[in-house]
């Protein structure tokens, strides 16, 4: 395989990996269709894209409260529930979905630039599956 082809495939993998991670982040705020409980990333003190967006959108007082809650009260179910509500209210989920769709689109566009072969349709299905999965 040529270097250009390898770079293109690598770029596709990177973009679909980002879309996959964002989809995983979204599960933390959704209904329990999957085995992952709600708020687990918050409990593990992980800053996900929806949460980062919310931290940028809220006022300084709320930002400090969220950060303090994650650092010091990450096992408090009522605080976790409030953080999830704030993420939803500020548009954090919509922002993350928009970004996930962007990386999905770029991955598909880059894949379509590659020559047709027996793997291309399978890769297209995999790329689409990443954002459609419910687990």
Label for each model-derived stretch:
Residues 7-11, 32-57, 63-101:
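Divalent-cation-assisted or electrostatically stabilized phosphate/pyrophosphate-binding catalytic cores
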Residues 7-32, 47, 51, 121-135:
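Active-site alpha-helical segments that house and flank conserved acidic catalytic motifs
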Residues 26-28, 68, 109:
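Intrinsically disordered, low-complexity segments enriched in polar/charged small residues
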Residues 61, 78, 82-135:
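C-terminal charged capping/lid subdomain of soluble metabolic enzymes
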């Amino acid at each position: 395989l040529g270097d250009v082809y390898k770079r293109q495939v690598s770029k596709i993998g990177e973009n679909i990996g980002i879309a996959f991670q964002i989809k995983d982040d979204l599960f933390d705020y959704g209904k329990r269709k999957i085995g992952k409980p709600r708020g687990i990333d918050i409990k593990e003190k992980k800053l996900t894209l929806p949460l980062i967006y919310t931290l940028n959108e809220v006022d300084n007082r709320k930002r400090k409260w969220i950060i303090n809650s994650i650092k010091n009260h990450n096992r408090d179910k009522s605080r976790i529930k409030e953080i999830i509500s704030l993420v939803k209210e500020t548009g954090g989920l919509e922002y993350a979905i928009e970004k996930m769709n962007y990386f999905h689109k770029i991955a598909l566009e880059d894949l379509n630039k590659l020559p047709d072969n027996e793997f291309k349709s399978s890769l297209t299905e995999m790329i689409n599956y990443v954002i459609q999965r419910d687990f």
